A protein has these predicted regions:
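A well-structured
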Residues: 1-278, 290
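Proline-centered turn/helix-capping motifs that create local helix->coil transitions or kinks
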Residues: 146-157, 300-307, 319
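Conserved oxyanion/phosphate-binding beta-strand-loop segments in alpha/beta enzyme cores
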Residues: 149, 153, 204, 314-324
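Short, well-ordered loop/turn elements at secondary-structure boundaries
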Residues: 201, 334-337, 348
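Short pre-active-site segment immediately N-terminal to the catalytic Zn-binding motif
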Residues: 279-284, 339-355
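Catalytic zinc-binding patch centered on the HExxH motif and its immediate surroundings
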Residues: 280-281, 315-336
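Carboxylate/His-rich catalytic cores and anion/metal-binding grooves
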Residues: 283-303
Length: 357
């Protein structure tokens, strides 16, 4: 099935809540590990539906942020999903406290219970209004940036297209592109600064309500970090400063010399060669065909996978006004279908999409 043909139907959050409540009751009344796992499996089929429909609404909004229907659907999940916090907490607590936990753990991936423990540190019914406010702010910013255009050499263009000129081989072109971007940022500084300020405050408020010193600690739990924490990252930053920064400085000095630049500026950092960095000689369609050849050469499985992705039109890679300006890979779990969004701009980054995403 082509991605554009996947049907969308809003998943009612209240129905999902009832599924959680049923699962919790079943786990508490379970007479064996099998019954616990059966209850979990039934719940996962419902949450898979929620995740699929939510991902579909987000994907279709990001492809066209002017689509009012999918904008509304996306906002529905953003505002209502936090209301599930209470039952999600109760479900994980039930899984952690079941007398059959030892046997259940043996039959699930080792990260399942670790994720329960970390997730419980990130959830609290007291912060539901704050989560809703946070989603609204993030959505406001995403909508603003998707409509963001820059005047450059008499043409209005989205930031995704301007980036091509920010990496141009001509230094004056790069400077002009950076100046154009800076001018628009300055003109909209009140909006951007205000958005950032509100986001910092609501996140700090959430963390304080949950008893954390600041949002950093809560942020690690929200991201599901299992193998490292704030202290380890602080040590890593010191290692970067001590071991990596000097190397990068030497490389940049050598690069500046090879490019004939005496004083490296911000607009020079993204370029490696005086006459400009290599750019694709193929158009998007040709690059995808070469990518298909590559994946077929790697293995039978990767060949079949890229064939499925291309045949199902599971890519949206061309930049255009009104399209969300980033890139991501998501999935529609119910249909076992991944999807990739990117914004080609004629740079080597276009090739990266076919390998990284």
């Amino acid at each position: 099935m082509k991605v554009c043909d996947i049907p969308y139907q809003r998943c009612d959050v209240e129905t999902v809540k009832k599924a959680y409540e049923k699962c919790i009751e079943s786990i508490k009344n379970a007479k064996s590990a099998d019954e616990v796992l059966a209850a979990r499996k039934e719940l996962l089929s419902v949450t898979e539906e929620l995740n699929t429909e939510s991902a579909l609404s987000y994907m279709r909004w990001s492809c066209n942020t002017k689509d009012e229907f999918y904008k509304g659907e996306k906002e529905y999940y953003e505002q209502n999903a936090p209301l599930l916090s209470g039952v999600q907490i109760a479900y994980m607590q039930a899984m952690l406290s079941t007398p059959y936990r030892a046997e259940v753990e043996k039959r699930l991936p080792v990260t399942v219970y670790k994720n329960y423990e970390v997730s419980l540190k990130a959830l609290d019914e007291r912060i539901v209004p704050d989560l809703q406010e946070e989603s609204a702010i993030v959505n406001e910013y995403a909508q603003f940036m998707s409509e963001f255009t820059v005047d450059f050499r008499g043409e209005k263009m989205p930031l995704t297209i301007l980036r091509r000129y920010m990496e141009d081989g001509d230094r004056e072109t790069r400077k002009e592109a950076f100046d154009a971007l800076g001018k628009v940022f300055e003109e909209n500084s009140e909006i951007l600064d205000g958005t950032f300020d509100r986001l910092v405050k609501v996140r700090d408020r959430m963390a304080k309500k949950m008893g954390y010193k600041d949002f950093v600690e809560l942020g690690y739990y929200r991201m599901g970090r299992l193998c490292y924490d704030r202290e380890k990252v602080e040590k890593f930053r010191q290692n970067v400063l001590k071991d990596i920064v000097p190397v990068v400085s030497r490389i940049r000095t050598a690069r500046a010399k090879s490019m004939g630049i005496d004083d490296m500026k911000l607009y020079d950092y993204g370029v490696c060669f005086a006459d400009g960095d290599p750019t694709p000689i193929l158009n998007a369609e040709q690059m995808f065909e070469k990518g298909r050849e590559m994946y077929h050469e790697m293995s039978k499985e990767t060949g079949e996978f890229i064939d499925m992705m291309i045949e199902n039109d599971a890519f949206d890679v061309m930049s255009r006004e009104g399209k969300w300006g980033g890139g991501y890979c998501t999935e529609f779990a119910k249909y076992k279908q991944p999807f990739i969004l990117a914004n080609f701009n004629g740079t080597s980054g276009d090739v990266d999409v076919l390998t990284h995403e």
